[in-house]
Amino acid sequence: MKRILSTVVGLILSGSIAFATEAAPDCIANGQVLPVNNEQVLQWKNNTKNQYKNRGHIYGVVSKIYQGKKSHQHFQVKLADGPRDTIEVIYNTSFNEIDNLKVGAVVESCGDYITSNARTGHYPASPDGAILHWVHESTNSARHESGYVVVDGVLHGMPHGRPFYDYEWEPNFDSLAPAM
């Protein structure tokens, strides 16, 4: 934990952060822009039944990368200071692999939230008790709104690197900064 916080603090204090390298899209939920909702996501994780679904827009730090997955990259994102304040993000590698994914990376992601604290069909429970998936451009907009993953300022989830929107994106580290 100290390593993650010191990494975040170092990034905050660094005047040469190169994060605005690509534009991040708005996170859309039911046709409206959804702000980062880490607190709401953690409330859903702790207070809803298995398979509860909603729209999530998270901002945090990669704290673990799950190995042994084939067509998807699975990784844990720390959303707050509590030991279980995490979510598993599941990214479809058919939109290219996230080549800059590493523990300590700063992540913003938008996608479909699902409480996953028990096996459902052939899907095991998430080790984090909740997942964020469909974090890429939607191939079926009637079923899913598009999502994305930004890792250390690089946008992922768009085919062939096509930008989603064209505007400046600036990370907000305020919610991750330790209390002074």
Placement of each model-derived feature along the sequence:
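Bacterial N-terminal signal peptides
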Residues: 7-16
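Positively charged n-region of N-terminal signal peptides that target proteins for export
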Residues: 1-4
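OB-fold and OB-like single-stranded nucleic-acid-recognition modules
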Residues: 21-180
